[in-house]
Amino acid sequence: DISIEDKVVSVRDYGLGIPLKSLAAAVSEMNTGGKYGGSAFKKTVGLNGVGVKAVNMLSSEFTARSVRDGEARTVTFAQGLEQSDTWESGVREKNGTFISFRVDEEVFGQYAYNLEYVEQMIRNYTYLNLGLTFNFNGSSYVSKNGLLDLLNENMTEEPLYPPIHLSGDDIEVAIAHGTGYGESYFSFVNGQYTSQGGTHQAAFREAIAKTVKEFYHKDYDPSDIRTSIIAAISVKVTDPVFESQTKIKLGSKEIEPGVSMRNFVVDFLGKHLDDYLHKHSETAQILQKKIVENEKERKAISGIQKKARETAKIGRAHV
C-alpha cells in the first residue's frame, strides 16, 4: 500500500517485518542492511539500506513501524535524529513494515511529487512480481503476464507479430517489432529498472542478432535485425555491480560467480528464441520480411547519402 497525501509519502508492506530490535538501526545507521547478515539476499539490488537512511536524514518527519507476530515497534525521527521509540504487544495487525516521511523543505525548498513517474515505477514493479498487487492512492496495479504486459502497454502501434515471451532461471525476455525506427529497450536487474542499460542489455542486443542470423542462416547486418524492435529483459544477478548509486546502469560482467553475463544471455536466447521461431513459422516469416525491408531501406539511404557526398565534392572542385 502506497500513498502520497499532503506531501507525506507512506508505504506499508505485508512481509515479515523488520526485526523489532533492529528497526531503529536499520533506518538510521550505516552498514546495518540485509547484506550484512550472511549469504541471504544475494540476488537483490542492494539491501545496504543507504536509501532509507538518506531519506531519514533529509526528512523533517520520518516514521518507521514494524509488526511481527503480535508485537510492534514504532520509531520516529526528524532530520535523522530519533524523537520517540514505542513498543507494543497484543497488536492485531498483519506482519510487515510501515514507513512514512515528509521531505525537509529547508533542504529542498518547495517541491511536488510527479505522480505519473511514481505510477510508472509501480507498474514496473508489478511486471517483475507476478500477481503482487500494489495499491497507490486508491488505484490497484497488478500484472499476470510479466514483461509481456510491459510490452503490450508501452507499444504505441500494433506489433508486426504476437510479442515473443520467454523465461527461464534468472531471466525473462519479451520481444516484438513495430514499423518505427531505432531500438527501444526496457531492462531490469533484480527488480531495478536500468534506464541506461548496461552489460545485460548489451548482451541481449548481441544475442538477438546472433540467434536470428543463425536461425535464418543469413549474415544479416545486426542493425537490420534490431531496427524497429521493442524489447524487455529482466535478469537476476548475484551481488550486482552498478556504475553509480542511482543503479540505472549495470556494470556486472558475471550473472553469478564463474558465469559471464554475455554467455548466459547468448546461450539462453540461442536455445529458447531459436526454438520459438521453429515452432512459430508465421512469426519467423514476418520477422524475416521485416529484416529484408530494413536492409533495403538502409542501403537505399546509404546510396542517397553517398551520391550527395559525391555531388558536394564535385561542387567544391568547381569553386
Kindly give the residue locations of the regions a language model identified.
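Short conserved segment of the HATPase_c
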Residues: 18-33
